[in-house]
Amino acid sequence: MAYPADFKYTKEHEWLKVDGNTGTIGITDHAQNSLGDIVFVELPKAGAEIIAGQTFGSVESVKAVSDLYAPVSGTVTEVNDALNTSPEDVNKDAHAAWMIKVTLKDPSEIAKLLSASDYEKFAAEEVGH
């Protein structure tokens, strides 16, 4: 799997794409592959505050329910409501099926995240390849 180079990643398998002061957040292809068929996504509402490293929602698959962890702190400005009716979009293209958009509270948090190549190595080690 090629991970988009302009995204940043967490060891909990979320991605962040930054555009100015806005961060778009989703889960990685590695995460959706590990989860299997996604059947439900629980996300915060617009206006909610999220804190880096803390849960902001969950993803339910046929295998398990997994928490979503915020890669950065901020205020939710937009939620991908299409995932309410089509959560399987995450399985089809995890890097296009974003979950939430936030206004970044502390852009310096971005430096703590993994690059695409570092995340790819981390994910490969996790599965033992």
Language model feature labels by segment:
Residues 32-33, 73-76, 81-83:
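Short, charged/polar surface micro-motifs in flexible loops or helix N-caps
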Residues 63, 83, 106:
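Residue-level detector of flexible, active-site-proximal loop/helix-junction positions
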Residues 1-55, 92-129:
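Acidic, low-complexity mobile loops and tails
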Residues 29, 63, 72:
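A short beta-strand motif that forms part of the nucleic acid-binding face
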Residues 13, 59, 68, 73-76:
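Conserved hydrophobic positions within beta-strands
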Residues 79-93:
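Short, charge-rich, low-complexity interaction segments located
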Residues 58-69, 86-88:
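Short, Lys/Arg- and Gly-enriched loop/turn segments at beta-strand edges
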